[in-house]
Design a protein with these regions (language model features):
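Residue-level signal for beta-strand positions within conserved beta-sheet cores that form or flank
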Residues: 22, 60, 81, 153, ...
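Residues at the C-termini of beta-strands that transition into short coil/loop
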Residues: 30, 68, 89, 161, ...
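Non-catalytic C-terminal accessory region of glycerolipid acyltransferases
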Residues: 97-250, 311-328
Length: 333
């Protein structure tokens, strides 16, 4: 029953994500392994949005290791457990909590033993900066711990890159790229070698702009209409000055109309925004507000159209709310 509910929830979240984003591009599906333990290692740029995208756009039905700090909100906590997320505690969460990680790792070993998939965001935290930060050792500990406990298993690491045209805006583009798998076929003494292999694989599939002159580079890319989610387009422009697939200029009118016809949802975000201390969570809260309240809002408009004197006015407003939501588009940033 729980698996059925999880499947239904993932379907609803997937539909909602396609309503929130203008375009979701998935590359490298042919690299998804079958019938073996998979440790999926991804970069982390957009808080809860990242795991939601991976939960809904891979057939692997993965479990997630997520920093324990996001489990504090009761509603979010229930949602996280329902979509197969497990907490990872760090020193900043308190030394006494670190011991709870062993229980989490034991749970992941059981998932992997059954040829399941576990996702870990190896950078350890999220950041909107478009480059790869140093990887933590959590995924190597998991891989070698699994091999020690179940020597007969043949786990692989699947690198995944996630890139956004505008991290904090709806109506933007997101690109998910699955890289080639990396076998865990070395002794634990070579964990550093495994880390470097995964780091190299991730850098090969994500937009990785050096810290030096970072802001100036981003500004140039946006001014020349380069797709910020495409590693190939970004590298082509930086090397040759050519723009293979310009994204065009977005005037923002569609976004303004969406806010007008979906004003109750936008107003709730304006109320919530001052309490969001970490701006990277902005997109997460916008999505959660839409996911939980958009359908009730549309049913309210439908009721106005069907059962009140407003009649055709209510129906017109409902149609415009839907249309402007699906036509919503924001510029890159």
């Amino acid at each position: 029953m729980k698996d059925l509910f999880n499947a239904i929830l993932r379907l609803l979240v997937k539909v909602a994500l396609h309503g929130y984003f203008k375009k979701i591009i998935v590359e490298g599906r042919e690299n998804l392994p079958e019938n073996r333990p998979v440790i999926l290692v991804a970069n982390h740029q957009n808080a809860l949005i990242d795991p939601l995208l991976l939960a809904t756009h891979t057939r692997l039905n993965p479990w997630f290791l997520t920093r324990a700090a996001v489990f504090t909100n009761p509603f979010v906590c229930k949602l996280l457990h329902l979509i197969r997320m497990l907490p990872v505690y760090r020193l900043r969460d308190g030394f006494s909590t670190i011991q709870q990680n062993q229980q989490t790792f034991d749970s992941t070993y059981e998932v992997l033993r059954k040829n399941g998939t576990v996702v870990i965001f190896a950078e350890g935290s999220h950041s909107r900066v478009r480059n790869l930060r140093p990887l933590s050792k959590g995924f190597t500990r998991m891989a070698f711990g699994l091999k020690e406990k179940y020597p007969e298993l043949e786990p692989v690491i699947l690198p995944v890159g996630i890139g956004f045209s505008a991290h904090m805006r709806s109506g933007s583009t997101v690109r998910i790229t699955f890289g080639k798998t990396i076998p865990v076929d070395m002794p634990s003494s070579q964990s550093g070698k495994l880390t470097k292999s995964v780091e190299k694989a991730l850098k090969a599939i994500i937009v990785d702009i050096p810290d030096q002159d970072y802001e100036a580079t981003i500004t140039r890319l946006i001014e020349h209409e380069v797709d910020l989610t495409s590693k190939r387009d970004v590298e082509t422009f930086l090397e040759t000055g050519a723009v293979p697939n310009p994204v065009g200029v977005v005037n923002g009118l569609g976004n303004k109309l969406m806010k007008i016809f979906n004003f109750p949802l936008f107003a709730l975000w304006l109320w919530k925004k001052p309490s969001v201390k970490d701006e990277v969570f902005s997109s997460t809260w916008k999505f959660l507000i839409g996911f939980t309240l958009a359908i009730p809002y549309y049913f309210f408009l439908l009721w106005l159209a069907m059962d009140t004197a407003l009649g055709s006015w209510g129906l017109t407003f409902l149609l415009l709310a839907w249309i402007t939501l699906w036509r919503n588009k924001n510029p890159q940033e």
